[in-house]
Amino acid sequence: MNTELTINQENKTKVHFVDSALINPTNPITVNLIGAGGTGSQVLTALARMNHALTELNHAGLFVRLWDDDVITEANLGRQLFAESELELYKSVALINRVNRFFGTNWKAETQKFEKNGLGKLKSNMKSEIYISCVDSVKSRFDIAEILNELKIDKGYYRNQCKYWIDFGNSQFTGQVLLSTIGNIKQPNSEKYETVENLPFITEEFGELLKISEAEDNTPSCSLAEALEKQDLFINSSLAQMGSSLLWSLFSNGLTENRGFFLNLKNFHSKPINL
């Protein structure tokens, strides 16, 4: 009998049940979107569409704070969602203004990096329930992980408890999206599934690979043509749509068997990352 029970447990599908506070919240779910470049600008639009869909389903929706200290240059036009009239504006301000006008939201722009202040302290507006990083440097990912690890320690009973981190990353033709939990998310008892309460950070699970990739050239592109030599025209938008679909599935299904995916746009191959 014990052997049979063990076999049944091994055959169970691994799933992660979404924190119940995100499924039926009293207030909009707070999201810190870090990076307003090629991927971040596309993810912001997807979040705005998602917010509209959620509110139509009698959900409280989303409140997004976009972090980026970069300004719009000629090289950003075309590959990123910016117009000539927006040149020299902060990326975060231009994008948030556009979304707020179009969707009637009251989302906020931060014209600074998502980092600790000059005294090494966390900023008050860093707290949110979901973090989405669309950054182009390995150091930024490790800095974000350090901040989230500090926030993870403070798990009192208050609004905006940090719960999930979704990281987007890409090279010229390939990319990946990875969902992580910030600490353990309590799981219900299930006879059908093997529940997983902790999904490691990308810096923990793929830290060595990230450090190897850091050796590649990350100098800024001075033109769109130069930018396209480093990143394909549609890698950012493809990654953004698929990654946003992962987040949407958390809200619509309440659970997930996959925590992300690898994408190769050159051969149109994608591979899910199972729990």
Task: Label every model-predicted segment.
Residues 27-57, 65-73:
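Glycine-rich adenosine-cofactor-binding loop
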Residues 2-39, 43, 137-139, 143-275:
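Glycine-rich phosphate/adenylate-binding loop
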Residues 53-59, 254-257:
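Phosphate-handling active-site elements
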Residues 55-61, 156-161:
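Short helix-terminating capping/connector loops at secondary-structure junctions
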Residues 60-105:
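Glycine-rich phosphate-binding loop and adjoining beta1-alpha1-beta2 segment
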Residues 30-34, 62-71, 111, 130-133, ...:
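Extended hydrophobic secondary-structure segments that form protein cores and membrane-embedded regions
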Residues 47-55, 81, 148-152:
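Active-site catalytic pocket residues across diverse enzymes, especially alpha/beta-hydrolases
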Residues 87-128, 135-142:
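A structured beta-alpha segment of the ubiquitous adenosine-cofactor-binding alpha/beta core
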